[in-house]
Structure formats: structure tokens, C-alpha cells
UniProtKB/Swiss-Prot annotation:
Homology family: Belongs to the universal ribosomal protein uS9 family.
The protein's name in its UniProt record: Small ribosomal subunit protein uS9
An example Gene Ontology biological process: translation
GO cellular component: cytosolic small ribosomal subunit
UniProt keyword terms in alphabetical order: Ribonucleoprotein, Ribosomal protein
GO MF annotations, alphabetized: RNA binding; structural constituent of ribosome
Length: 161
């Protein structure tokens, strides 16, 4: 009887481990505390270099904590979007450096970089991130000013007579 109980307990433990793995959908070999995943993200004139590693959810941008670098809460929420979609909100630490552009462009570059790094860390996230539109680069840039006009599209006032 005791051997049967031990076997059933082992089977139950194994089943619970397997069910947890299926819920997380992260392959076993990818949960590695040593490995780092690198990706670059771009938006407008901003370029972000992102390093992702298994951790406690700490995000550092240009040697500042995320809330210090982006004071607006909406920016922070959009940067956390890939983690919310993949349900890995406190499982990865992010270190990134951003150059160029303004605050909005830098936010988009970091978002794109984090999404690409998450895709590299666990390929099972690819479909989720692709469906959320986080892996595609937003190619919209400022239209150039044309000569003979006031702005890119604004013309001088036209007079018939």
C-alpha cells in the first residue's frame, strides 16, 4: 500500500508540473537564468537596444527605473504590453538603452525591442505577439518639408485675382 501511495504521489506531482508548464507555455530549456536575449527596436528616429533575462520584473532604461524615465503612466502601460499579453509580467528583467527621437518614439522603440527579445526567449510567444501587432515595426516617419510650401503639406494661400 505504501508503494502505491508513493507512486500515485509521484504521478500527481508530475501531472501538476506538466500542467504548470502548459499554462506558462515556456519550453523547459528556455527557462535559463544565465542566458540573456538581445534585440533592437526602432520607431521614428529612436533606436532601442534591449537585453532580456529571467528575473523579477525590473525594467531599467538608460540607467534609470522605468517610472523615472517615463513619468506618464500611459507610457509605462504600453511598454508593459508584451509582458501582459504573454502573462510574464514579473518573470523577466529588462535593461535597455535608447538613443534619438522624442519620448513617444523612444517608447515605441522600447516596446518593439522588448517584443522581439521575448520572441527570441520563447518561440511559443511568436503567435501571441504577432497577433497583438507588437513584432511589426511601425514605419511611419515625419514627412519632409517641400520647397515652395510652408510645411510638408501646407501650401501658401492661393489667390485667383
Amino acid at each position: 500500500m505504501t508503494e502505491l501511495k508513493i507512486k500515485t504521489e509521484k504521478v500527481v506531482k508530475q501531472l501538476t508540473k506538466e500542467s504548470l508548464k502548459s499554462v506558462l507555455k515556456i519550453p523547459k530549456e528556455k527557462i535559463d537564468s544565465v542566458s540573456k536575449f538581445y534585440a533592437t527596436g526602432k520607431r521614428k528616429n529612436a533606436i532601442a537596444r534591449v537585453w532580456l533575462k529571467v528575473g523579477k520584473g525590473k525594467i531599467v532604461v538608460n540607467n534609470k527605473i522605468l517610472n523615472q524615465y517615463f513619468p506618464s503612466e500611459t507610457y509605462v502601460k504600453t511598454i508593459l504590453q508584451p509582458f501582459i499579453l504573454t502573462k510574464t509580467i514579473d518573470q523577466y528583467d529588462v535593461i535597455c538603452t535608447v538613443k534619438g527621437g522624442g519620448i513617444s518614439g523612444q517608447k515605441g522603440a522600447i516596446l518593439h525591442g522588448i517584443s522581439k527579445a521575448l520572441d527570441k526567449s520563447a518561440p511559443c510567444f511568436h503567435a501571441i505577439l504577432r497577433k497583438g501587432g507588437l513584432l511589426t515595426r511601425d514605419s511611419r516617419v515625419v514627412e519632409r518639408k517641400k520647397y515652395g510650401q510652408r510645411k510638408a503639406r501646407k501650401k501658401t494661400q492661393f489667390s485667383k485675382r
